[in-house]
Structures are given as structure tokens and as C-alpha cells.
Swiss-Prot record:
Listed Pfam families: Adenine_deam_C, Amidohydro_1
Cofactor(s) required for function per UniProt: Mn(2+)
Protein name as it appears in the record: Adenine deaminase
Gene3D superfamilies: Metal-dependent hydrolases (3.20.20.140), Urease, subunit C, domain 1 (2.30.40.10)
Top EC category: hydrolase
Organism: Methylobacterium nodulans (strain LMG 21967 / CNCM I-2342 / ORS 2060)
EC number(s) reported in the record: 3.5.4.2
Keywords (A to Z) from UniProt: Hydrolase, Manganese
SUPFAM superfamilies hit by this protein: Composite domain of metallo-dependent hydrolases (SSF51338), Metallo-dependent hydrolases (SSF51556)
Reaction(s) catalysed by this chain's protein: adenine + H2O + H(+) = hypoxanthine + NH4(+)
GO biological process: adenine catabolic process
Amino acid sequence: MPAEIARRIAQGAGREPADLVIRGARLLDLVTGELVPTDIAVCGEVVVGTYGEYEGARVIEAASRIAVPGFIDTHLHIESSLITPHEFDRCVLPHGVTTAIWDPHELANVLGTAAFDYALQASTETAMDIRVQLSSCVPATDLESAGARIEAADLLPYRDHPRSLGIAEFMNFPGVVQADPGCLAKLAAFAGRHVDGHAPLLSGSGLNAYAAAGIRTDHEATGAAEALEKIRKGMTVLIREGSVSKDLAALAPLLTVATSPFLAFCTDDRNPLDIAEEGHLDHLIRTAIRLGVPPLAAYRAASLSAATAFGLTDRGMIAPGRRADIVLLDDLEACAVARVIAGGRAVEEALFAGRARTPAPGRGSVKAAPVAAEDFRIPGADGAETSVIGVVPGRIITEHRRLELPAANGCAGCDLDQDVVKVAVIARHGRPGMGRGFVQGFGLRRGAIASSVGHDSHNLCVVGADDADMAVAINRLIALQGGFVVAAGGTVLAELALPIAGLMSDLPFEAVRDALHPLREAARTLGCTLPEPFLQVAFLPLPVIPHLKITDRGLVDVDRMRLLG
């Protein structure tokens, strides 16, 4: 190490040629907002010189391109990209995302601590710097059947792992506010480490209590007033723009040069089609700027503010002594990524070739018995008021609606005129269980859509206008050992297998992307009006997001944290 420090000193002083020089860049100064012409000298994986001219063993001609720090995704579930972390690395790093903070919460709900073992090992095999936050709430609640339970004692062996930052989104915010002993044990075990938050709509004294527990970041703010209260109370708000949860438009007015130290970006859940068609954090940055956010504020949020919030003090700026994560842009406002340097290495296809790939665990994890059409019958009287999950497009928050539905032979049925169809969740972790209900807002006129991605316990979820097609879709999911299925007329119209824990494919990114096109098209032929139907299905079972959800145990009134009778 002393020899490496000596090399950095010599190269920074100009006494030796730098390992790498990026020549003729215009550096975005995150302190002043200026675009400053300069070379950038790199020794190993560290920047050693800026604001001058340097000689290097290797030279990249920037040709007046704009140099900005590498982007940091502050909270995501790589599983939601449906691909392995190695494929995620290959396809997202070229978008300028040089650091990702991964909560393997989805895998953990299926596999328990084996998910941490896999995530931590895989994070050593990627060119992107992937840091892991340990999933704090597995299961999220006791209102569903999960594949695992993780307590404070299970987290402790991973606390001091060099790839671990702390614990991930603390979803049991009522438990924190009420000083639940299990929550306190986890918070105490990770005192002094980063504790990430998850507190939708929490405010006032409840938010005071939550922040006082040492929780410093939150990505669940969906409105500017909510986000402002959180940053005023010392939290960093992670502005989320995923494939379903789209909060950027609502929060963009809050992101100014003055507030940018307290705001960062995250994707949470982003699928391969959106990555391919729109991008990743580069999409968030250009969208924010288009919405009126000053470019300096947007790029600060994407780098320096993110690094500061998570204690990653070795990155976030292009400055001597900082990690050489550098993005060269053709256009600042369009965030047009031309070239990426990650840890001092040029991002090229050769960078990913020949890397070790630890096999992903979790095959054979879908343990559910076949179902029949009659299993989806819901008792009810004609004209009786029924609780219905109301989908809010672009949100994972749902409404608790009370609607009159038709019934025949003692069973309530779909009402297509009101855009109401059935939804069911089937237990998949080896124990029987099935919750049934109704949902409004999918636009389905026929058929069924099913998914083994069902936050957070990842039981099987199906939305459908026909009981027989719902059975076809679920039974095909079981045969595939997880995935997405669209069925109508008694046949499968489109499918994608996700055999890794029922969550991820072992195929290349491009193959998964291409398989999603016919799935979306098949959903549209059923009448589905939602732009991302599969992730929308996946969030219907999430009983920690208001207001009405469904699990394998039935409908959940999230506001009261209880099952409906």
C-alpha cells in the first residue's frame, strides 16, 4: 500500500506519467457549476490530477466532451431487472452507473441468508462497484407466507463484510415507531452503520420517531411536501423513478441547487425493456433537467449527494484522491453518455469478458400445487358492496375502494363495465394458501396475467377476467418454476421463465428484453391499459404500501395492518 500511495503522489505531482490521462475534457465542477477545460490524470483506480495538463501511459481524447462523476443508484433490487447481477453490470454500466447499492430483498424473501452470500460474492465479480445492503424486514409483515425469516442474529455475521454498507429499507415503520423489540434489536445491531428507510406518508411525530432511530435515507416520498418534511428532519430523500413507481415529476420542483445535498436518485425496480428503451440513471437525469431541474443540481444528486448520504467518501467528485468513476457526455442537458470510466478502467465489451460468475441459487423454489378454475370463486351476493383494490397508474400505492359487484349462484363476479376483475395470490413456499379478491384499473376484457414476482414474499399472483384462464396461467407458472405468463381462451399466449428463485432469468439481457415484447403485446390484446402490467401485478401483494393489498392470506387493510374478514 505505501508503494501505491507513493505512485499516486508521483503521478499527481507530475513527476511520473499517469497510468491514464483523459485529455481535453470539460469538467463539471460540482462546487461552482462551472465547465472547466482540463486533463484528468488517473493512477490505478484513483484520480490524481485535475485542472492542469498531464502526460499518461494511456490517453483517452475527450475532444471537449463534458466529464461528470459516475452515477450512483442509491437503492435498487437487481432482481427486478430479471437478470443476474453480472448481466446487469454488462448492460447498465455503459449508461454511466458506476456504483449500485443493492438490496437483495427479493432473493432474501425466497432464500433467506443464502441471498446475502450470493449477492456479496457476485458483487466482487462485477466491473460496476456493487455494494450490498442487508435486507432488514424478511418477511415484511406477518400477513403473508414467506420463504424465510431473517432476525437480527442472522444479519450480524454480515455486518462487517467489506461489501456491506448496512441494512436496507426498514419497511416495518410502525414497528420502529412503536419500539417493537425485534426492530430495536436490528437497529441496535447496526448502530453506527447506514440504515436505509422506507416510510411512505409518515409525518409529524411518527417521522420524528423514525428518524430518531438512526434511519437516514428514504425512497418512498411520492409528493414534494412529504419529501420536504423528510429532508428538513435530516433525512436524504432518494428520488425514485422505476418502471412502476414514478415519483420524479412530483419531486423535481424540490430539487434545486440549494436542496441538492439532501436529495439523490434511485430506480428501486426497473425492468429490461425500460433499461433498453430509456436508459437507467441517465434517463432520470435528463428527465429531471427536462422538468426544470438545474443541471448542477441533477448531477450532484446523481453522484456527490448520493455518495455522501451512504458514507462513500471515496467517490462522488472528479477530484484527486477520489475513485476514478468518470462519465464523458456529448451533451450535458440530454445526459448523452459517450464513454464511461469505472474505477480507472475504460468500459468496453472486453471488460466483461472472462469474468467469474458465481452460479445463482434458488432453482426449484416454486413449491405450489396445481389449481383449478373453481379455486378462484369468491362468495358474494348480487349488488353487495365489496372491497376492491384500486390501481393508481405510476404508483405502487393502491386505493381501498368499495364497489357494488354482480353475483350469480352465490359468487361475486367481475364487472368489466367498472374495469373490475379478479386477483388471487397463491402460496409458493411449500405451504398451502390462497387469497382472493377484486382489482380495478387493469383494463382487462378477457384472459389472465400471472407473475411469480410478487413483492415481497413472491408468492404467485394472477389478475384475470376468466377463472379458467387464471388457472391456466398459474399452472404454467408452476411448470416454468417462475416467470410471467399471459393466457386467454384456455391457452398460453406468451411467457418468460424466471427459474432463479422465480425472480431472475439465466439468459443474457438481450434475450430477456426480447421476450418481454410479446408479453406486453399479449397483455394489450387482453385489453390491458397499463404500460407495465407485470410489475403492477407484482406490487399488488405488498402489504407495507398503502392502502389495500392482497396476500396468500387474503385482503390486507394496510392502514390498519390487518386482514379483512
